[in-house]
């Protein structure tokens, strides 16, 4: 793949030599906000090679999507906004859109272009009846399994949530007999609410409704949280160790891990050759598999017509087949368009035993409706998880009722 990227960049750079050169002062600047570590150096270089009259200035704003949202809201007041920005799928889009600074992405797209985007993405990036951003680096949750530990314990790869719980108990071990667990059967990283929402949806729960109302106090939410509480109480899942879950899996201290498909490069680097692991389909409930969309989108901010048009050219390039296959999907992210499923890259992934289950799971992609209360739900769920994992006697139903009140209060004041 590195060879392919090098050839692509070489081709674009050669092509740029045939395009008219402009003086530095005549260049049009595009401001592109991302998180600090999202450099996009290769992508920007490739775009600039095709557009020598354009200078893309990437500005890293904070280390998290929280920081980005805070900066966008502040910039909406000051007027110092970027032309293009990275938007988290998780939260912030409603607030930014309601501030009146975001141009609906559908304004720039033909009907054919919109129809090529997989429908699940529009579920997530539609707000107030408008398609406000275009999916970019998109991911979904999968189950990572340490194949060596499963084989040693004689445990089959689980395909359901119930089987995950059963397998976790069998995989949990005190290897040296000192009374301290050395290998936990299962854990969830610090983006735990993402996986909880997936399980709730698989169980038939709907959190954000079409009319904008929000229901978190539902039986499916209580059931999933009780399962997690019981696993922590039984010791098959460590209590409140979400922050180290990925590293623990890399070191063989956790046998099964919920994680993003886009997290594989980091996992592979950490595991090295210590053991074999696999990415398998997210475990089902009642035969239902839910693959909620993660990752981010690209949004265009209001400016003049010429700059907005140029911003759309940049977004088009970043979400094109060549760019996504050569850069984005190579990092573990997903195809965002139906047409991408016919590319050589995706066909190769479907034929690759390591990636086949992940790319086959694309058919189960689901986008939870965007809502201003997203961040509140996320925060409340993290608080509940912290309590129920440390207290086996915590009243899950009461905690969920309290979360519903927080949600209702937020929406009442919004």
Task: State what each model feature region is.
Residues 1-30, 49, 401, 405-414:
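Short, low-complexity disordered leader/linker segments with a strong preference
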Residues 26-36, 54-59, 83-84, 132, ...:
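Short, well-ordered beta-strand elements
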Residues 29-44, 61-65, 139, 191, ...:
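Extracytoplasmic "Venus flytrap"
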Residues 46-117, 124-126, 148-159, 253-256, ...:
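Extracytoplasmic "Venus flytrap"/periplasmic binding protein-like
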Residues 49-50, 55-57, 78, 152-153, ...:
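Extracytoplasmic/periplasmic substrate-recognition and gating elements
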Residues 88-141, 156, 165, 181-188, ...:
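Hinge/lid segment of periplasmic solute-binding proteins
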Residues 122-123, 273, 277-280, 329-383, ...:
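Long, aromatic- and glycine/proline-rich binding clefts that accommodate carbohydrate-like moieties
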Residues 167-170, 211-239, 282:
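Glycine-centered hinge/linker elements that transmit conformational signals in sensory
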């Amino acid at each position: 793949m590195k060879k392919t990227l090098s050839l692509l960049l070489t081709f674009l750079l050669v092509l740029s030599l045939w395009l008219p050169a402009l003086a530095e002062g005549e260049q049009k600047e595009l401001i592109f906000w991302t998180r600090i570590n999202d450099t996009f150096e290769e992508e920007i270089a490739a775009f600039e090679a095709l557009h020598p009259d354009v200078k893309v200035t990437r500005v890293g704003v904070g280390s998290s999507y929280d920081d980005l949202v805070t900066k966008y809201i502040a910039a909406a007041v000051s007027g110092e906004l970027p032309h293009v920005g990275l938007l988290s799928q998780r939260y912030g889009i409603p607030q930014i859109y309601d501030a009146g600074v975001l141009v609906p992405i559908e304004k720039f797209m033909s009907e054919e272009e919109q129809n090529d985007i997989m429908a699940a993405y529009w579920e997530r990036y539609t707000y107030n009846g408008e398609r406000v951003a275009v999916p970019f680096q998109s991911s979904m949750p999968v189950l990572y399994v340490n194949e060596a530990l499963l084989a040693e314990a004689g445990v089959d790869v689980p395909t359901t949530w119930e089987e995950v719980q059963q397998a976790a108990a069998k995989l949990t071990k005190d290897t040296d007999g000192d009374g301290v667990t050395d290998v936990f059967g299962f854990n969830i990283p610090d983006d735990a609410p993402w996986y909880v929402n997936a399980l709730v949806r698989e169980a038939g729960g709907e959190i954000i409704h079409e009319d904008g109302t929000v229901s978190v106090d539902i039986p499916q939410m209580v059931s999933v949280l009780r399962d997690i509480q019981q696993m922590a109480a039984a010791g098959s899942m460590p209590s409140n160790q979400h922050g180290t879950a990925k590293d623990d899996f890399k070191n063989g201290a956790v046998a099964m891990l919920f994680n993003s498909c886009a997290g594989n490069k980091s996992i592979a680097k950490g595991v090295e050759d210590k053991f074999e692991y696999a990415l398998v389909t997210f475990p089902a409930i009642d035969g239902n598999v839910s693959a909620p969309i993660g990752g981010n989108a690209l949004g265009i901010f209001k400016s003049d017509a010429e700059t907005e048009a140029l911003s759309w050219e940049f977004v088009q390039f970043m979400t094109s087949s060549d760019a996504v296959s050569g850069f984005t999907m190579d990092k573990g992210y997903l195809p965002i368009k139906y047409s991408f499923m016919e590319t050589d890259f995706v066909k190769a992934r479907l034929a690759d035993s390591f990636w086949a289950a992940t790319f086959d799971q694309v058919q189960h992609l689901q986008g939870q409706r965007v809502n201003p209360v997203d961040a509140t739900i996320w925060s409340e769920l993290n608080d509940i998880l912290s309590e129920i994992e440390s207290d086996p006697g915590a009243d899950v139903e009461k905690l969920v009722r309290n979360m519903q009140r927080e949600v209702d209060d937020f929406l009442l004041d919004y």
